[in-house]
Amino acid sequence: AIYRGLVGSEMCIRDSDYVDWEVELVAVIGKEGKNIPKENALEHVAGLCVGQDISDRPAQFATTPAMFNLGKSFDTYGPMGPALVSLDLLENCESLDIECKWKGETVQKSNTSDLIFNISSIISYLSEIVSLNVGDTIWTGTPSGVGIASGKFLKDGDILTSSIEGLGSMENKCVRISDHSRANIVPEFMKGFLKD
């Protein structure tokens, strides 16, 4: 298995009962820029790919205020693939069907036209804050249907399949690893979201 590459067949999840999924459209920067006008933003994109934004919910809510990025930062979280597709191969990169299946069940289904902020707006805004460099990845957000909303979470052996129109599908098998961490210490307020 490839654990830190663009795409791999297995995704190690830490020994936690509350690891969640989010399918996302990922833009990969191909031309550096700062203060990029919205109308020129797509000129800075090398291509798009599918991203599986994996989140360990207890790690996110372990502190006050919550630190959402912390729960997404474990080794092997955030696989991307199956290929980097250039914008000229897509009819409209701002309107692509997006879907996630967990163990064969469709749990997320939408279109990137439903994003709160489209790709161009996100790139332009971010470039006002930080310079964008070649190879930077911008994850654009996820539709409804993440596991925490229904009390469903990734387990050892689960298959997660994420697809975006024109970009292909990426399938990963979840493999549980032990890491001697505070994996299942759940903050009190979060317990109402979780089902036994």
Model-derived regions: residue spans:
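Structural signature of FAD isoalloxazine-binding scaffolds in flavoprotein oxidoreductases
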Residues: 4, 19-21, 25, 156-166
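A generic local secondary-structure boundary/capping motif
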Residues: 14-19, 24-25, 33-40, 68-72, ...
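RNA pseudouridine synthases
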Residues: 29-31, 36-51, 57
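Catalytic-pocket segment enriched in acidic/His residues
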Residues: 10, 57-196
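Short coil/turn connectors at secondary-structure junctions
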Residues: 15-16, 21-24, 43-46, 94-96, ...
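Short beta-strand segments
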Residues: 20-30, 51-53, 141, 164
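Single conserved hydrophobic/aromatic residue that forms the stacking wall/gate
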Residues: 1-13
